[in-house]
Amino acid sequence: MKIRTTIAVMAAKITGHVCKLMGRQGVTWAGKVAMKICPDILEELSSQVREKIFVVCGTNGKTTTNNMLCAGLEAEGKKVICNHTGSNMLNGVVAAFVLGAKFSGKLDADYACIEVDEASTRHVFTRIRPDYMVMTNLFRDQLDRYGEIDITMNILEEMMKKVPDMKVIVNGDDALSAYLAMDCGNPFVTYGISKPVIENKTNEIREGRFCKCCGERLIYSFYHYSQLGDYRCPKCGFKRPEIDFDATDVKVDDQIAFTVEDKRIVANYKGFYNVYNILAAYAGIRTAGFEAEHFNEMLRKFNPENGRNEQFRIKGTSVVLNLAKNPAGFNQNISAVMQDGSPKDIIIVINDNAQDGKDISWLWDVDFDLFGGDNINSITVSGIRCQDMRLRLKYVDIPSMLENDVETAIRKRIGDGCGNLYVLVNYTALFGTRNILKKLEGEK
């Protein structure tokens, strides 16, 4: 163990603690400090993982899937390092290892579950060698950062080929992800849902409309949402692969339930998209060689924190906070909200900071007209781009109120005695809004 590694771990832990005292998250700063002192600290610490390293990539669902995977491995009795907060660029990945290490620089972990931003795989995969990659989906996201989705796919393909023995656990219902897994030559297994579950009412922009092999328009027998579904190419024969972990008898009413490998999985969550998150975590655990006997028990105890369907109780109001950062994710959020038939109020917070992407034209690809139900009492818009959000709603004849300050918006709704409040935010609004809700929850 190099003395520089020990110093880097100590400095990072102190940095993280100071940031928390200042009311900041501090995770990425801890990683940045550690890298500055010891540039190869990620190689040093990741090499101490005794068994296997998972990485989780994809546009939507990374944090929830990664945290479920971690909890599932822990339920099997394993010690796991995980970037629970969703800090998924290089500094955040480094922070997961340094904050999980002892002050001596020793790491006591059987497994690592690491969520990695797709573009950051170029920096992470050159420092660690993953054994498994879980790929959730590939949707359009942050156009000014990623550009067209082909750029993201090219980055992932380049990195996957650098680790040819890494096994990929891929969403077979996504033509883009499935093509990538097939094309790269890595060993892979698939998960998916082979029969339609819900009526697809949205007019979504579908990214995987054309075959990546030959360019022909794909034919779908059904869609689940966005481009996820049962597809085939009429020209070259590319099609949805055989599914290894197939969710059948799927229910998404008051809770999620489905059967996979003759095992009934039940979770007290909402949102059809969560079927995929749960199924991906299950497939990861099974692929690693576990029987997943404790999977349902884990789901009963699992708390989806960090603003992913996170629940709060504030002065009699039930509050749900969720991240919505691109058209596919936002449409699924709207579907989950409208699945709740009780009267509700909604707050939408949209920022355009660097991590969000400055280009917010994606708002025009979200089906906000689905918010036109009778059970919505009010919609309030907030955040840096609240005016743009209000204009977008106006174009589909959805009235809204504007409140620049997020805390004021939340206090007003709770003060008015609303019973159910949904707060939908994009990325940089998430941490601050979560802090506000936790503070309000703690008030007498």
Question: What are the language-model segments listed below?
Answer:
Residues 3-192, 200-202, 206-210:
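Phosphate-binding loop of NTP-binding sites
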Residues 115, 136, 169, 277, ...:
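Residue-level signal for inorganic ion chemistry
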